[in-house]
Amino acid sequence: MASESETLNPSARIMTFYPTMEEFRNFSRYIAYIESQGAHRAGLAKVVPPKEWKPRASYDDIDDLVIPAPIQQLVTGQSGLFTQYNIQKKAMTVREFRKIANSDKYCTPRYSEFEELERKYWKNLTFNPPIYGADVNGTLYEKHVDEWNIGRLRTILDLVEKESGITIEGVNTPYLYFGMWKTSFAWHTEDMDLYSINYLHFGEPKSWYSVPPEHGKRLERLAKGFFPGSAQSCEAFLRHKMTLISPLMLKKYGIPFDKVTQEAGEFMITFPYGYHAGFNHGFNCAESTNFATRRWIEYGKQAVLCSCRKDMVKISMDVFVRKFQPERYKLWKAGKDNTVIDHTLPTPEAAEFLKESELPPRAGNEEECPEDDMEGVEDGEEGDLKTSLAKHRIGTKRHRVCLEIPQEVSQSELFPKEDLSSEQYEMTECPAALAPVRPTHSSVRQVEDGLTFPDYSDSTEVKFEELKNVKLEEEDEEEEQEAAALDLSVNPASVGGRLVFSGSKKKSSSSLGSGSSRDSVSSDSETSEPLSCRAQGQTGVLTVHSYAKGDGRVTVGEPCMRKKGSTARSFSERELAEVADEYMFSLEENKKSKGRRQPLSKLPRHHPLVLQECVSDDETSEQLTPEEEAEETEAWAKPLSQLWQNRPPNFEAEKEFNETMAQQAPHCAVCMIFQTYHQVEFGGFNQNCGNASDLAPQKQRTKPLIPEMCFTSTGCGTDINLSTPYLEEDGTSILVSCKKCSVRVHASCYGVPPAKASEDWMCSRCSANALEEDCCLCSLRGGALQRANDDRWVHVSCAVAILEARFVNIAERSPVDVSKIPLPRFKLKCIFCKKRRKRTAGCCVQCSHGRCPTAFHVSCAQAAGVMMQPDDWPFVVFITCFRHKIPNLERAKGALQSITAGQKVISKHKNGRFYQCEVVRLTTETFYEVNFDDGSFSDNLYPEDIVSQDCLQFGPPAEGEVVQVRWTDGQVYGAKFVASHPIQMYQVEFEDGSQLVVKRDDVYTLDEELPKRVKSRLSVASDMRFNEIFTEKEVKQEKKRQRVINSRYREDYIESALYRAIME
């Protein structure tokens, strides 16, 4: 049968089917038939129903239907790679939505053919964000319609509701989607890799793109290459439905795809593991849901689910395996069922069509589910506009990531149109019979003098008239730019409701000004503002949320020391104060420089393009004398005392430093840049990194931490080669050590061909005998260096982290082109080494959070423990300074001090403020964790919440046991028991005599650093309501401001001499 299936639709093109009314009556059987013709190989198929079939007589009576949570789709990105964010809007009716969709602002542009409209879509994707009425619970089918009724398809997926009484909205109940021009659905497969059906009730067409399931892994690899940050945070990040990749990019990287246009009155069927995306041509209404066949069961068992959110859709496969694969049930439960999926095979129900040339006589609806699979499943009752609700409805299909923002985003001007090449496929007509099938295809945030920017933080609208002098970096002529990233700023003070999501963190590099030179930098805006929505609390701390990396609250541990025998420590208040002082100093400089414009006509003396022989006497005399050397007090800098570039060269110290770094995970001088991130996010390094004691001097292979995207992405173009040189098939690379300086690197990180990876290998600097050359982009020696394009040298890690630095030969990782680095970067002062050097040197990077001006050299930041992590296209590295690390820091459980009875602590009183109190008793309370049948979970249930057994008497259920849980709404839901968690509880007594029982997370010791939210609400108990009722604070009297007559009007009128005397 495998050989037969391979001959079916070998080109994996999207197929279109025209069933007769008789053929149309049996849904499950017809799905089996189209798979027997190979339709599933494309991942998408179109079915045109008979002309006499109508799901609804008229759509004139739906204008009052409410769209409860419309979303505005903000898209950021460029060059065919985009990320889509959703801003939740207030509820509206279909009538109101139609009026908006057909308005001049949102209506479909004029076009002569589909290819022209497609080009306009991809070019204007980032402008004028449209509104999508998505995920509206309900159906537009009339009650009497039985054929292909999306509300009751009667497939084996209905077993979920039959067995457990659970409905998952949008999965086994229908959803309505009201679209307008440019509303999109990003690349994704269905939840649990299910089938889906989509019917376009009325309105403008909908365009679909599809990648065949057998090539789905290739699309995933491409997406992970362009979005490594999201991929590291969640293996299945495409399920977030946020990633848009244009067909031009797919074609460029050889990803097979097809496209088709769905007209009103047509069905689209997506198949398991079929990646699809698309957009709406204008106002329309579609209805969809998921379904399953027996072929899906294997996909469901192996589906890779989203790991960053526990409320994503998850369906227990137990009932399906037990019923349809009983012979493999025990093997599957033991985790030994390692079946390899063949994407070319049709569903088992299609066997009859592979043996016959014509369809046998049709059976009635009672036989729709083959082999009586659905015996006992009854039709549910549905109203015209109401959803069929089960008795126990718990969850929804998905929670869209939204920002609740009341303001409208202003419409922007469209960029000039460009052509988008697309393939054409021949279309052949065929009769309505089933046998013949018709294949169809239809910049730097500078706070110094020299750069000034207008402040958009107080406005939600960004006018493109103000950005007319912004010129994006030119790309290669053969790769036409499809869209430019839209730079938006949302007023933090106007954000109403909860802020759930924020957009991209950084702005892509661009040349500002009207000139054509890429090095020219001038603008009227204060900073390069990222596309993000920021919430600002009472304390003024800027909080940036990012769904792709979890919930945005970065959990950060102590910075790790990279000296042998040293231990991790927390930063002292003095060090944090220094960072804060630097930040305030930068803000003062920023305020002073506002409005000033100075030409950058002269290169800074420390710019790498300045020839080495032109160094002034000033610079050569920077080396400190022994009397001038101060004793190093900061722990992170003590091992580096002999490595600062203002000290005399010390090759032995460099060698010792390199040897020390080689013994610490990840054992690569280049990968060290992401060391802090991996320790914080992943609790250290996985087994692929190995232990220092286990590493042999040579031939050890480990997995590099740096994605290939970090070497290929630059701010200068989009001609990217995502090849992975010198990487093995399992993603590992050999570690090599220089026999002269002992620096250790991955062959892939440094560009070492396998033939040269030997014990006699030497790094580029040692091979050139340039032992006294230092990195021109930082202040430290040691590490892995490569030659720059001006005969100077740079750290590979510095070149990776600085967006504008470019590897000329990507495979060899050299030379490094530093000529495109903006000059203002070289004026930034590193907060770590500015007190250790007399002059500014090197090139700094800045914190990626909002407008934070904190700057540091890459090597200094890496040594001090600043968290740097891979970012998504078109950026490279996302950097979090200590200032932004602290507010989001969740106290590590292991770092919490033990508390004893009688100890004075700080806790929250019932009045909402924090007071000192005393611990009077310690108790232990047990909480249960369960996973509900709809995929949701709870980890703070009391034992008495389990109603299926008496847990107080008999103890907790066995792990994995099915239980019944009484929820806070009084309903009882099915769930599986996960674990019981004994939690230490503390009974505290306040000075007013009141007592509370709290968890350890809600208690703070007196010597513990308090979060700002606690500091702002910390009070002292007193008998008086107002402490200062009888005392007054000394008020510092300021000199009265002198009143001066406006000189412009001094001579315009006559005033009395007395009045003039008073005024002056």
Swiss-Prot record:
Top-level taxon: Eukaryota
Entry-annotated residues carrying Phosphoserine: 523
One Gene Ontology term, aspect cellular component: chromatin
Record-listed E.C. numbers: 1.14.11.66, 1.14.11.69
C2HC pre-PHD-type ZnF: 772-805
Reactions accelerated catalytically: N(6),N(6),N(6)-trimethyl-L-lysyl(9)-[histone H3] + 2 2-oxoglutarate + 2 O2 = N(6)-methyl-L-lysyl(9)-[histone H3] + 2 formaldehyde + 2 succinate + 2 CO2; N(6),N(6),N(6)-trimethyl-L-lysyl(36)-[histone H3] + 2 2-oxoglutarate + 2 O2 = N(6)-methyl-L-lysyl(36)-[histone H3] + 2 formaldehyde + 2 succinate + 2 CO2
Compositionally biased region (Acidic residues): 366-382, 616-634
UniProt modification remark: Ubiquitinated by RNF8 and RNF168, leading to its degradation. Degradation promotes accessibility of H4K20me2 mark for DNA repair protein TP53BP1, which is then recruited. Also ubiquitinated by the SCF(FBXO22) complex; leading to proteasomal degradation.
Named cofactor requirement(s): Fe(2+)
Alphabetically ordered keywords of this record: Acetylation, Chromatin regulator, Dioxygenase, Iron, Metal-binding, Nucleus, Oxidoreductase, Phosphoprotein, Repeat, Transcription, Transcription regulation, Ubl conjugation, Zinc, Zinc-finger
Quaternary data: Interacts with histone deacetylase proteins HDAC1, HDAC2 and HDAC3. Interacts with RB and NCOR1. Interacts with VRK1.
Protein name, per record: Lysine-specific demethylase 4A
Organism this protein belongs to: Pongo abelii (Sumatran orangutan)
